[in-house]
């Protein structure tokens, strides 16, 4: 379940670079991953999950036009030969100028977006993904528990084998509570541009404490959410000048607290469950190309 025949972690095969373009010009690059909604009435829909700002170049609720008009991402052709991939390129608007992504109706400020993937895009590919079951584990997580992001910092990764980078930090807030009333966990980590959209996991290889208290032994991969951004603080720096009268001229400097924002997995589960598949097919899919 966790590795393929070549010993590659399942998680390494669910991620993809997500590149925003305007025409053929690259605007920016982030990370995305594949999530499957297991629902007999919805035919196990595959979603590309990433950040809103990765798809548009803007923050949620910024009321700005997207900086690009199409994206590209990748599927592995053969997990036993991960260097072979299929490139997929899609517009982010239909011919009638409707966006192809969905967002959370409950938290429109959440920097999360999902795109249902057409079945034609997965032909000739081996699609690896995570499901809601990955959010369910008896592993106890708490502040200081390890958390791992998987993605493409500054677009850096193993391009020969088309495999991502794993970066590990620790949980910095109480994970069972919503930080500032939003479905967020803060993490202590050194993360960089390009990691936006990375899936976040709590991982155990061996002994771990269960939520009931006892320690057990096993292998756990628990999906916690999606990395979005770092927490910044802004402070004023003044240059003292003596002219005819005292004055202050200054600049503002932004500093990172080395705290990252993780939008919780439940947010993704709920927003994908709430999609009206028939309406999406009629309004988006049939008018995409």
Tell me the role of every PLM-derived stretch:
Residues 25-46:
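A conserved glycine-rich beta-strand in the N-terminal activation segment of trypsin-fold
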Residues 55-58:
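N-terminal positively charged helical leader segments and presequences
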Residues 8-11, 48, 202-289:
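C-terminal subregion of chymotrypsin/trypsin-like serine protease catalytic domains
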Residues 44-46, 185, 224:
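Short aromatic-glycine-enriched beta-strand elements
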């Amino acid at each position: 379940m966790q590795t393929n025949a070549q010993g590659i972690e399942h998680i390494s095969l669910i991620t993809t670079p997500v590149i925003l373009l305007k025409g053929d010009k690259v605007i920016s690059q982030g990370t995305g991953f594949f999530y499957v909604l297991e629902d007999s009435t919805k035919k196990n829909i595959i979603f590309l999950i990433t950040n809103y700002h990765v798809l548009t170049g803007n923050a949620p609720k910024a009321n700005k036009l997207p900086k690009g008009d199409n994206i590209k991402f990748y599927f592995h052709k053969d997990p036993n030969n991960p260097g072979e991939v299929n490139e997929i390129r899609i517009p982010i608007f239909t011919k009638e100028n409707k966006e192809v992504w969905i967002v959370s109706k409950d938290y429109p400020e959440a920097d999360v977006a999902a795109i249902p993937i057409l079945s034609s895009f997965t032909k000739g590919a081996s699609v690896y993904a995570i499901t809601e079951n990955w959010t369910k584990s008896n592993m106890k997580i708490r502040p200081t528990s390890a958390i791992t992001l998987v993605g493409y910092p500054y677009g850096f990764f193993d391009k020969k084998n088309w495999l991502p980078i794993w970066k590990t930090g620790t949980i910095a807030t109480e994970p069972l509570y919503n930080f500032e009333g939003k479905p967020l966990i803060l993490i202590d980590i050194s993360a960089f541009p390009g990691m936006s959209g990375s899936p976040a996991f709590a991982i155990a290889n061996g002994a771990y404490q269960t939520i009931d208290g006892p320690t057990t032994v096993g292998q756990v991969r628990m999906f916690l959410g999606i990395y979005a951004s770092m927490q910044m603080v802004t402070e004023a720096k003044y240059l003292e000048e003596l002219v005819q009268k005292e004055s202050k001229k200054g600049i503002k400097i932004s500093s990172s607290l080395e705290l990252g924002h993780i939008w919780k997995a439940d947010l993704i589960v709920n927003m994908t469950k709430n999609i009206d598949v028939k309406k999406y097919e009629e309004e988006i899919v049939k008018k995409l190309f």
